[in-house]
Amino acid sequence: MVGQRANGYHELHSLVCLTEFGDQIHLSPGAEFSFQVIGPYAAGIPVDESNLVVQAAKCMAQTHSKSLDCQIILEKNLPMASGIGGGSSDAAAVMRALSQYWSVPLPNVDELMALGADIPVCMNKGLTLMQGAGEDVTQLSTAPNWGLVLVNPNVGVSTPAVFNALDSKQNPPMQNVAENCVDIAWLGDQRNDLEPSAKAMVPEVATVVAAISEIPQCQVARMSGSGATCFGLFTDIKRANLAADHLQQAHPNWWVVATKMV
């Protein structure tokens, strides 16, 4: 985090990537609109207009004067409110699906920001630099062939509380990002400004980061976003799979997934 605007929005300077593993959106033609949530993390997910998927679908329909003649099923595989952009990426996926279904363009950045500040960056694959409040996104590289392990201790973290607990909201940005974003050693020197306050509030986050870091072949271990999900970066998916197996056996109550960037 590099600052805060007068309207309360935080100024960010973040590297973001999408992964192969995630929630799934299933869209099919229908006489009228319907929305259903299934999957291991479906419990408690609203199916009314408070859901960002429904808002995104209606935004697309209104923008292009279309009737919502489709059925959408959200397969919820990611923990809720876990710092990995599940809701925002779901909304982005629905918009991409409807763009293809109706053969219409995607909304502009202002329309995306009106739905959610993290949605614009979820439209890009590869490594993307997100700046401003989320409206300034620049794709820097195609996805490196690295392996990732995502770990969540199944403990919630309050995003507003994490932001409010920050010692400083004026921090230096990353330097020479475009030249170094695929350099694992450089990535290991970068930080998540939200991580210290999250660890202080939820000690399980520190436990997870430490457990990932202790795996000999882990290159980088950090918290993702505002937590509580953390990630380990490995040179390939084989090493990530072995690490995920080890972590799941050692901590059966944690959510652990090995995946790749896309």
Task: Identify the residue ranges that each predicted region occupies.
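DPxDG-like acidic metal-binding loop motif
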Residues: 53, 82-107, 121, 125
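ATP-binding N-lobe of GHMP and related small-molecule kinases
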Residues: 1-82, 99-100, 104-105, 143-145, ...
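Phosphate-handling active-site elements
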Residues: 62-73, 96-115, 236-249
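Short glycine/threonine-rich catalytic loop with a Thr-x-Gly-x-Asp
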Residues: 82-90, 219-228
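Residue-level signal for inorganic ion chemistry
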Residues: 25-27, 53, 87, 151, ...
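Conserved, helical-rich catalytic subdomain that frames metal- and/or nucleotide-binding sites
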Residues: 35, 124-220, 235-241, 245-253, ...
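Short hydrophobic/aromatic beta-strand micro-patches
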Residues: 231-233
